[in-house]
Regions:
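N-terminal binding-site loop/beta-alpha segment at the start of enzyme catalytic domains
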Residues: 1-76
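Conserved, mostly hydrophobic/aromatic
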Residues: 6, 18, 44, 52, ...
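Short, well-ordered coil/turn segments that N-cap beta-strands
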Residues: 11-16, 47-51, 72-76, 109-113, ...
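Glycine-rich phosphate-binding "P-loop"
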Residues: 20-34, 150-155, 236-247
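Glycine/proline-rich, positively charged
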Residues: 26-28, 32, 42, 89-181, ...
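Structured C-terminal cap/extension of enzyme domains
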Residues: 45, 171, 189-313
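Alpha-helix-loop-beta-strand connector modules within alpha/beta enzyme cores
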Residues: 61, 65-81, 133-144
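A short, structured active-site edge motif that brings together acidic residues
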Residues: 74-87, 117-118, 177
Length: 313
């Protein structure tokens, strides 16, 4: 699998990273249990995936830790996230420290490679910089984390307002950014900055419910059109993707979604969350295929040019 360097971190990450969140949360979100989650993590490592992402709020750190405690820590990159507020207030320094230390215990490790502040809202950004970030910087000096990241709440911040502000600063080594076939606004709003500043980019939301199958996409777009949130021309996306599949240039809508993100300049690693070993293996096959045909992109992308209100959720 292709390896990309995460910005200036010098971390060499596989094109596909295993995501411990999303709808499935390694299957625990579908009540498949922790043993199944552990099988998915092990299958990812066995397939050569070398970046694993989770968060204290996902309840998948323990399953991941149960697997990686038996793996050479230098063979993979471990990423987790801090929930920066509790009961509507910013966590004080003692609670920020306690959050990371609890994550380390669940993950059975003495450090994480990337520690993100999770889902930062624009209105909270300055307070996070003033009060939360210094705690992470101190813990980095203690060796508990190597790099500091920030993620956006893409489901509600589809215009990347928080990360557009954060990208101007020099604080962040890695960013987790929402990007997919329905909303590729990060291309113009963020990637030129992250590339210039050497900020590593993890892609989330490559595939969400809307992009799983033709029926989901048709229903998703129709509801947005009926509500006046989208132009009716966006409905042409479904037949265009169907045509791509029927011509044998793509096996599924999901494959198209992964390939779209995999070949986007500015994206270093695409996160894939699943609770199925079989789905994981298929995603690994799909993401390593060539870029989508230029002729298809020339017809598809204008449908969503300027669209910033969708996450695909």
């Amino acid at each position: 699998m292709r390896l990309n360097t995460l910005g200036k971190t010098n971390i060499r990450a596989t094109l596909l990273g295993l995501g411990g969140g999303g709808f499935s949360r390694l299957g625990t979100g579908q009540n498949k249990g922790e043993p199944n989650a552990e099988r998915v993590v092990q299958a990812a490592l066995d397939a050569g995936v070398n970046l694993i992402d989770t968060a204290e709020g996902y309840d998948t750190e323990t399953a991941i830790g149960n697997v990686i405690q038996n793996v050479d820590r230098t063979k993979f990159t471990l990423s987790t996230k801090l929930t920066y507020k509790k009961d509507g207030r910013l966590k004080p320094p003692t609670e920020v420290r306690a959050s990371l230390e609890a994550s380390l215990r669940r993950l059975h490790t003495d450090h994480v490679d990337i520690y993100h502040i999770h889902g930062v809202k624009l209105d909270d950004y300055q307070a996070v910089v003033d009060h939360t970030l210094p705690v992470l910087q101190r813990m980095r000096a203690e060796g508990k984390l190597r790099f500091i990241g920030i993620t956006e709440g893409f489901a509600s911040d589809t215009e990347h307002r928080a990360l557009q502000r954060a990208a101007q600063d020099g604080y962040w080594d890695v960013m987790m950014i929402g990007f997919n076939l329905l909303n590729f606004s990060a291309r113009d709003r963020l990637f030129h900055i992250t590339r210039a500043k050497g900020i590593g980019v993890l892609c989330m939301f490559a595939v969400r419910q809307a992009l799983i199958c033709p029926q989901n996409l048709q229903s998703f777009l129709q509801k947005k059109v009926d509500a006046g949130e989208l132009d009716a021309q966006t409905l042409h996306a479904v037949p265009l993707l169907r045509e791509l599949v029927e011509r044998g240039e793509c096996s599924s809508f999901t494959e198209a979604a992964y390939r779209f993100c995999a070949h986007e300049p500015g994206i270093d690693c695409v996160l894939s969350g699943t609770g199925s070993v079989e789905h994981l293996r298929q995603n690994l096959i799909d993401i390593q295929k060539p870029a989508l045909p230029a002729e298809f992109l020339a017809r598809f992308e204008p449908l969503f040019a300027g669209v910033t209100a969708l996450s695909g959720q």
